Amino acid sequence: MAILAFQKPDKVLMLEADNFFGKFEFRPLEPGYGITIGNALRRILLSSLEGFAITSIKIDGVDHEFGTIPGVIEDVTNIILNLKQVRFKHIVDDIENEKVSITVSGSEVFKAGDIGKQLTGFEILNPDLVICRLDPTASFQIELTINKGRGYVPADENRDPNADIHVIAIDSIFTPIRNVKYSIENFRVEQKTDYEKLVLEIATDGSIHPKEALKEAAKILIHHFMLFSDEKIAIETADTEGNEEFDEEVLHMRQLLKSKLADMDLSVRALNCLKAADVETLGELVKFNKNDLLKFRNFGKKSLTELDELLESLNLSFGMDITKYKLDKE
């Protein structure tokens, strides 16, 4: 049975955007879908995007985070709090973690930009952030470890049991998202005024463009929902021997091939011809060659061209071998 069409946006409107802030609009949406989509995207954006942060430090002569450094105004606890605010932008694909050793001396202020001078794979986005202040005659050696992560990770999870005893693990804020908020307004479509418009505002630390952050969050949601949309879902026992695993591409293709032709934007003539031949899904359609279709009753070249364009837009083709997608095992 065909699913009734939903009122949904043709595209996402980017009202304004720079490296630190983006404002996006989704319209029209069915009643209730504004909060459904807005809340889901907000939670994913705030908690699940990857970023880079300092995960541990080592300071010569300091054994724990409650220590002090001679000639330095801030104690180690405050230095750590400042280091947690340093924001990194990934600039070299092959480098996803980096350890850097810095000698701080001959200066009254140690800033985040001084860390950036020693880095290879990262750029510091807030170079003016003050890490600590010290006497011009004071000096100390600090080693920083930068890693890739997701969301917020406490110091206990960053602690390496094999690390040197003087290494201090710290809390890490990996998320590149500063804030996300959304609002929902009424939107009119023809004579109906109860549709919704979702406005989503995303603030980042500059390491990712808001547009890319939104795309990444949507991708994470899609990957999770893909499993639930697959009709092969079944309750499994603890014995999983013989169960087959499918990668994401196969799962996506299975779902696509099971799509009903009645839900596609096809002419009535083409749909009636296919229905008369008991061809109801994309999977059933792509099994045929073009010559086979032309043998269908009342099926002409115009309908063939229409179907050919549809399959091409979906990266499908006539005569495909779809046995590996196991559509028959439902």
From Swiss-Prot:
Q: What is this protein called?
A: DNA-directed RNA polymerase subunit alpha
Identify one Pfam family in the record: RNA_pol_A_bac
Enumerate the CDD domains for this protein.
RNAP_alpha_NTD
Q: Which GO terms describe its molecular function?
A: DNA binding; DNA-directed RNA polymerase activity; protein dimerization activity
Q: Which GO terms describe its biological process?
A: DNA-templated transcription
Region annotated Alpha N-terminal domain (alpha-NTD), chain positions: 1-231
A GO cellular component annotation here is: cytoplasm
State its Enzyme Commission number(s): 2.7.7.6
Q: Which family does it belong to?
A: Belongs to the RNA polymerase alpha chain family.
Known function: DNA-dependent RNA polymerase catalyzes the transcription of DNA into RNA using the four ribonucleoside triphosphates as substrates.
Q: Which gene encodes it?
A: rpoA
Species, as recorded: Parabacteroides distasonis (strain ATCC 8503 / DSM 20701 / CIP 104284 / JCM 5825 / NCTC 11152)
Enzymatic reactions? RNA(n) + a ribonucleoside 5'-triphosphate = RNA(n+1) + diphosphate
From the record, what ranges are coiled-coil?
A: none
Q: InterPro entries, from UniProt?
A: DNA-dir_RNA_pol_insert, DNA-dir_RNA_pol_RpoA/D/Rpb3, DNA-dir_RpoA, RBP11-like, RNAP_asu_C, RNApol_insert_sf
Q: How does it assemble?
A: Homodimer. The RNAP catalytic core consists of 2 alpha, 1 beta, 1 beta' and 1 omega subunit. When a sigma factor is associated with the core the holoenzyme is formed, which can initiate transcription.
Q: Per the record, what about its domains? A: The N-terminal domain is essential for RNAP assembly and basal transcription, whereas the C-terminal domain is involved in interaction with transcriptional regulators and with upstream promoter elements.
- Supply the Gene3D superfamilies for this chain: 5' to 3' exonuclease, C-terminal subdomain, DNA-directed RNA polymerase, insert domain, RNA polymerase, RBP11-like subunit
Task: Write the record's keywords in alphabetical order, separated by commas.
Answer: DNA-directed RNA polymerase, Nucleotidyltransferase, Transcription, Transferase
Region described as Alpha C-terminal domain (alpha-CTD): spans on this chain = 253-330
